[in-house]
């Protein structure tokens, strides 16, 4: 395939699996338009749905220490989810962070500020650094293009395992 860029976004043929429609729009943009956008309501209807969800979670977790658990990387997305859950939804989330050896000082600082600012609890699971390095080296040697798989697998499995062990039913992502 010759070089091509989506007529709607910046995705291009550097993604070897990308496909374009007859108008030059990539499959990612088309998927967003047909699948995500019709269900994406940031207005009054979305706020009402979020409030209803919060009330259901609160009713379901009466008498428990936490309403939900949120995986926290220290980046923008998970930090915003934590803010929305605690401040907008009025939930009592437990923030769950996995230290797989790659924490930057900025991420650690972001996490500390967020926890202090929201007044919520944080649990950090520390992954064995030697095992993580061995996995990452194995993925590199195997030529696997997605080098985040070892960390992502550790993050999600630790999060869900902790939630199950501690009977925290609601996971917010």
Range-by-range predicted roles:
Residues 3-173:
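ATP-dependent adenylation/nucleotidyltransferase module used to activate substrates
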């Amino acid at each position: 395939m010759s070089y091509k860029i989506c007529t709607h976004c910046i995705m291009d043929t550097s993604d070897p699996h990308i496909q374009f429609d007859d108008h030059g729009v990539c499959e990612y943009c088309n998927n967003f338009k047909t699948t995500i956008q019709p269900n994406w309501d940031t207005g009054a209807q979305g706020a009402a749905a979020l409030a209803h969800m919060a009330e259901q979670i609160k009713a379901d977790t009466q008498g428990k220490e936490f309403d939900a658990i949120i995986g926290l990387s220290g980046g923008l997305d998970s930090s915003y989810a934590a803010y929305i859950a605690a401040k907008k939804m009025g939930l009592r989330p437990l923030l769950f962070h996995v230290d797989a050896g790659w924490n930057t000082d900025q991420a650690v600082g972001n996490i500390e500020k967020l926890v202090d600012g929201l007044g919520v609890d944080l649990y950090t699971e520390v992954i064995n650094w030697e095992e993580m390095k061995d996995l990452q080296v194995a993925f590199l040697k195997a030529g696997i293009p997605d080098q985040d798989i070892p960390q992502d697998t550790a993050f999600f499995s630790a999060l869900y395992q902790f939630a199950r062990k501690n009977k925290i039913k609601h996971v917010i992502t």
